Structure formats: C-alpha cells, structure tokens
Amino acid sequence: KYSEQTINDPVKTVLESPVVKEQTFIIKGKNYIAEVSNVGGGSIVSYALTKHLKKSESSLNLIDGYNSNNLVVSFVNQSGEIISLDKSWSLVSGGSANLSETNPEVSFLFTTEHLGRQVTKELFFYFDSYEIDISTSLRSLKDVSLDEKYTLSWVGGLPEHEGTQDAMFMEGLISQVGNIESFRVGAAGFFGSSSSSNIDAEEKRYVGQADFAGYRTKYFGLFFIPQKSDLVEITKYPTPLRAGVDIGITQDINLEKNKLYLGPLDYSSVENLGVGLEEKILGWQWLSSVSWLVYSIMISLYGFIPNYGVVVVLFAILIKLVTYPLMAKQLRSSKKM
C-alpha cells in the first residue's frame, strides 16, 4: 500500500511571481473564528477555536508562523518541474461573514493564471462545523501537466499546545481500504519531549486511494478527505520550536473535490466525517465498545448537568453503585475464609 523513503534533496520548484496585494477575510462560526488570505488561493492565516478551551484561554489558534502557508496547489509540468501556485490569486466572490443558523455557510472563489490559463479554487465554511470543502480546478492546464494530476498541500502541521504531552500523541494518520496506518512524529518514550531535536526528517508515500489522511496532536487534528487520491505524501521534519508536518494529496486533475477537517478531536465532530476516523479516537479496537458506552453515558449526563467536573463525580458514583453487589459478595466470601 505504501513505500517508505528518507527525504532527499528537494525537487526544483518553480513559483509564480507575486503581483496581487494580499487581502484577508474573517469568518465567524459557532465555535471558531477563521481568517483567510487570497495568497495561496485561500490560505488559512488564523483559525482560533472558541470552544474546548482551558479556563485561562479566551481562544486557541491552530495556525502559527510555521503552517500559515497552507492549502497550496501545485502540479508537475512537462519539464518535470513542480509548479507551485502559491501567489497571484485574486478574490472573485465572497467576503467576511458572521455565520449563524439562518446564514449557515459562506464560500470564497479565488482565481489565478498560469501561462495565461485560468485556475480556480473555492472554499466553503460552515456555521456549526469544523469542515471546510475545497474545490480546485486546473483543467485548463491538463495539456501542460506531465501526468494530468495536481497536489493540494498542508504545510507545517499544527502548533503544540500541551507541551511534552503532545509528543506522545503526535502522528500522521492515513486510512486505506478501512485500515488506519500511523506515522509517528513525536518522541516514543512516555516521558519523551517534543523538542525538534528529537525529530528526524522523514517522508512516507502512500500509493492509492485514501479514505482520509492527516496529522494529529493530543487534542487537535487536520485531515483531508479526498475525492479519490492517487498518492499521499506525509513528511515530518524539525523546526526551531516544534515538529513540522506536511500533508500532500495528489489526485487526477479532473477530480476537483477535497474536504479538510481542522479542529478538535471531538468524537461527534469527527464521526460526522463518515470515514472511520472516530475509531482512532476511541483507541484499541477491543476497547471501542467500552469507550463508546462511557462516552454515551457522560454525554447524556452532561445534557442534564452542563459541568464535566460534576459529571465525572456522578459517573464515579454510578460505577460504584453498579459494582457494589459484586464487591459486597467478594467481601462476604473473604470474611468466611
């Protein structure tokens, strides 16, 4: 299903020259505030979560200086050069929006040119979802492409908000034919540090269709759900402050659809993707039924008591009541002995 290799010297990349002034647009959803730039044809330059926060936090941003150059489109030309279309994009339609139940979505259509031919990319944001739909059209470049394919990339991974705890969970993930494979990024030891000095540069290539592909830290993740991929490349490397992880999705130039999930590893949100990613959130397969039962009970209790601290205490009491008859029987048996 995949071949593994160590990173060699990068392939020569040809970049489009910047001629369009940068513009940014703000989208306010139910649980996030996103800022999108026309650079890169809709790169997300800020994505602040307003839910799943610590008491000391007013928001938590999943974008920093290492991953703001994201959602870049590229293709290989007839000379074998990688053409990265990361500049010179203009907004065709769309604008800043306050989303709501009555105004649940907004779209941004960007356009650029290569060799005088139009390329478009459209992003769709939703009020009550961390999903972003992406439609990319390079059909006009089909005859100048070497293999009639294009790549949509996320560069830089995610910030690490939990310090050394993140290192235990950092991994690239890909699902092919229902089988989820892990590409470890963080330090392996229980007390391992997420220092960039512990991360070796490495790339893995997964050939064939992927159900999803992405990267996670302890509590957050980014995942592509491609229309039909031909190749997925996951690359890890050190940066001065944290791990860098690039995700590249390559698919046929006629297939324009991709979905991006960017947000917390919340079970219900991840389950809505419909690609089986929630199985990874639940952990080992033999524990999944137990995990689901515990999750369902706690969510039900939270519906009546909107305080997870109280819910945990009540859940502990409930477990005590359920197991008390067995414990009492064991206690009587031990007294008889």
Sequence positions of predicted segments:
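Soluble non-transmembrane domains of integral membrane proteins
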Residues: V19-K280
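Short, Gly/Pro- and small/polar-rich lid/capping loops
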Residues: Y2-F25
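Cytosolic-side membrane-insertion boundary helix
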Residues: S269-V311
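Membrane-interface amphipathic helices and adjacent TM-edge segments
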Residues: I319-M337
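Alpha-helical membrane-inserting segments
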Residues: M298-L301, L318, V322
